[in-house]
Design a protein with these regions (language model features):
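N-terminal signal peptide c-region/cleavage motif recognized by signal peptidases
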Residues: 3-5
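Short, aromatic-enriched amphipathic alpha-helices that serve as compact interaction elements
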Residues: 11-31
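Extracytoplasmic/secreted proteins, especially bacterial periplasmic and envelope-associated proteins
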Residues: 14-21, 39, 43, 67
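Surface-exposed, charged secondary-structure patches
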Residues: 45-105
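Low-complexity, intrinsically disordered terminal/linker segments enriched in charged
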Residues: 91-93, 99, 104-106, 124-146
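Hydrophobic/aromatic beta-strand elements that line small-molecule binding cavities or substrate pockets
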Residues: 109-115
């Protein structure tokens, strides 16, 4: 599947290429791209790691599961996600909008991506109007998934 792209300058092209890695699909259209933490800015990556240490501890102690997982953060549901109508659009500043369908679900996410010398890193993801970074920070500060 070839995503539709808007006209982009060099920095925007690098941001788009990063997002394309996250939403890569196989021949049937199923998601098999990278997880975003691999491309997270160092501070964001540290926040993710700290939050997952807490999440893992909660799950081991209580058997409860937290509703935080990278595939959910990227707009993928349970199981196999079949991506269609992928559109990647650079917005103003560091934002890149990603829209796609997964079955009957329509997803609209924004990635905060900064680039230096065409090396780009993800600072945050806005999914369903919520900052993923802030959700992880809340887990760290409260030591809970609530």
């Amino acid at each position: 599947m070839v995503p539709s792209l808007s006209f982009a300058d060099g920095s925007d092209a690098a941001k788009i290429n990063l997002v394309k890695k996250l939403y890569k699909t196989d021949k049937q259209g199923y998601a098999n791209g990278e997880t975003y933490s691999k491309y997270a800015a160092p501070e964001f990556k540290n926040i993710i790691k700290q939050a997952y240490r807490i999440i893992d501890g909660i799950e081991r102690r209580t058997g409860d599961t937290c509703d935080m997982a990278e595939h959910y953060d990227q707009g993928f549901g349970n199981g196999d996600s079949k991506i269609s109508k992928l559109k990647i659009t650079p917005l103003s500043g560091n934002l890149v909008q990603v829209t796609f369908s997964d079955g009957s679900l329509k997803n609209n996410l924004k990635y905060d991506i900064s680039c230096t010398s065409n090396r780009c890193v993800i600072n945050d993801i806005i999914n369903d109007g919520r900052s993923i970074r802030k959700q992880y920070q809340k887990i760290i500060s409260s030591k809970s998934c609530d």
